[in-house]
Amino acid sequence: MRQTLPLLLLTVLRPSWADPPQEKVPLFRVTQQGPWGSSGSNATDSPCEGLPAADATALTLANRNLERLPGCLPRTLRSLDASHNLLRALSTSELGHLEQLQVLTLRHNRIAALRWGPGGPAGLHTLDLSYNQLAALPPCTGPALSSLRALALAGNPLRALQPRAFACFPALQLLNLSCTALGRGAQGGIAEAAFAGEDGAPLVTLEVLDLSGTFLERVESGWIRDLPKLTSLYLRKMPRLTTLEGDIFKMTPNLQQLDCQDSPALASVATHIFQDTPHLQVLLFQNCNLSSFPPWTLDSSQVLSINLFGNPLTCSCDLSWLLTDAKRTVLSRAADTMCAPAAGSSGPFSASLSLSQLPGVCQSDQSTTLGASHPPCFNRSTYAQGTTVAPSAAPATRPAGDQQSVSKAPNVGSRTIAAWPHSDAREGTAPSTTNSVAGHSNSSVFPRAASTTRTQHRGEHAPELVLEPDISAASTPLASKLLGPFPTSWDRSISSPQPGQRTHATPQAPNPSLSEGEIPVLLLDDYSEEEEGRKEEVGTPHQDVPCDYHPCKHLQTPCAELQRRWRCRCPGLSGEDTIPDPPRLQGVTETTDTSALVHWCAPNSVVHGYQIRYSAEGWAGNQSVVGVIYATARQHPLYGLSPGTTYRVCVLAANRAGLSQPRSSGWRSPCAAFTTKPSFALLLSGLCAASGLLLASTVVLSACLCRRGQTLGLQRCDTHLVAYKNPAFDDYPLGLQTVS
């Protein structure tokens, strides 16, 4: 019996040894329960298979056909991307074990149910749920995600926002509701208190709101009043938006950017609504349906950039205010923005014009009209010396306190009239007088023909009056009525001398005597070369001058800000709704055993920040991510590296559209490899060990040599004791016999 049992065991085990190796069948399979207690869960392979080590900080699970998030995710995760999967529901309590999670991206899933509530990640600041199947948002019962700053719901079939829909997020700063179904249907839209907090107070933290691609017909003051800190409002590609009017911006004084481009139904903008936005900097209305764009009171000290390209504008001098004061307003693509004449119009607006031509056309038309309607104001005796007008036709002057820092100001009185046709000039009040009718009768000779005409008049011993620098010109009531609250740079040359002003004449003739009640108008050269040089010194650079911008300079001011400040030219940049190009990684310097400094160059794209991803060679799954880096940075240190290790590092650019995609090759590759130096501690330990070994070897060798030397000394002493004399010869002396 004892011999039979081993034989049976050998017989049973023999096929497993002889057959080829087969796939191992696990003894246990891991099963996972549904997210909200689903009982119909089949046994599946472990979802944790292939996940990185427990200390990973960033993980991408895109395109894995996941129906739920794995429950064995590393607790150290800070960024999780599970886009393009089959997720159907999300509950914040499921993510409670990810205490360090900050960014969660779940774009392009099938999420149709949300549950806000306590127990979610306390540090989560970015949640992207774009392009899912959310038809409604769950009610907020408390501050579920108190640290959430950015929420993206773009592309969801949301039809309405209920009151206090975002009260769960008291720190929310950016909300993307673009391409949703808001406004579609009878009950669709935004409720009156949709952006109110838990206690009904305004959502004071929200700064950026994107409603592009929705079906809203208008912006209602009932819901926008709860956004007092709003700085950017995006209303792009809205097919039903028809008008902007009312007191919609009364409670949003911090608004800086309004983007309504590509909204084809937008036909009316009551521009006076912008009087409540003193910090306004950008207005984008390209490719809308606007026919006019009247001025309003500009109280802002910022330079306002306006884009009206692609609108069916009607030619009128009412639009010339956009080009009057380049220090206050900048019209983008003025040469490409066209206006068409009104039906049945004649005169200067008989054909289509670009808006850049309006000032010259309006100036020529106003000069001719005023010259024909006011001939009694010009008498020959005074005209040769300086044009004078009666008090009823007093020239427009600059407001009191406005300083002029050029020696010769351009004489553009007629241009001032053309720039403000909405003033009392249309009501019969005589505006500022023009110079010479002959000099301005034809706009085709502007400006040199006008200068020639004035030169001929000055040849008749007319004194040339020149304003000294830093002259303060006080305003008259008529000038204030004409200009209203819009100070302009064109009216600097037309001023009435005040007691504080200094004037001097050329030596050819004395100052002309003025009749009582007359006000002098100074005739100066228009656009002389000397004047242009001085303008360039005291004014802002020309638009054709490239900006002082280098894409690789650390802490480089963004080119858009340089352009607003200096009126210079920036390189072409892709929009903020386009995924940015990858940065160009310059290299890695200052490499030590545990740190390195990464350098890169900015791409030709709008960038809101950068991100650095790096991993040790052979450990691509265990990738570390450096959070959002400021857009002005061009270098960033990496710490906590392992000594003597080769790393692969990539720099990514980020904007509203997402992160740039790294290129595998090319001179603009955003990735590079570098190796850290060996540890100094290990090197010192090795040197110490080698030194100790050498010392020990030296001691042992010395001991061996000493011992051997002693042995040789004893042997030499024994040799000296040996007698070489045979004692036998002492008793028997040797006798030498002589052979005869």
Curated annotation (Swiss-Prot):
May play an important role in hippocampus-dependent long-lasting memory. The gene is LRRN4. Residues 430-454, 490-514 have a biased composition (Polar residues). This is Leucine-rich repeat neuronal protein 4. It is found in: Membrane. InterPro entries: FN3_dom (IPR003961), FN3_sf (IPR036116), Ig-like_fold (IPR013783), Leu-rich_rpt (IPR001611), Leu-rich_rpt_typical-subtyp (IPR003591), LRR_dom_sf (IPR032675). Keywords: Glycoprotein, Leucine-rich repeat, Membrane, Repeat, Signal, Transmembrane, Transmembrane helix. Residues 389-517 are annotated as: Disordered. Gene3D superfamilies: Immunoglobulins, Ribonuclease Inhibitor. It is a single-pass type I membrane protein. Its main location: membrane. The lineage of its organism: Eukaryota, Metazoa, Chordata, Craniata, Vertebrata. Residues 579-679 form the Fibronectin type-III domain. GO terms for cellular component: extracellular exosome; plasma membrane. Glycans are attached at N42, N176, N289, N379, N442, N622. It comes from Homo sapiens. Residues 19-679 are extracellular. PANTHER family: IG(IMMUNOGLOBULIN) AND LRR(LEUCINE RICH REPEAT) DOMAINS (PTHR24366), LEUCINE-RICH REPEAT NEURONAL PROTEIN 4 (PTHR24366:SF13). Residues 1-18 form the signal peptide. LRR repeats lie at residues 51-74, 75-97, 98-123, 125-144, 145-168, 174-197, 203-226, 228-251, 253-276, 277-300. Residues 701-740 are cytoplasmic. One of its GO terms (biological process) is visual learning. The chain crosses the membrane at residues 680-700.
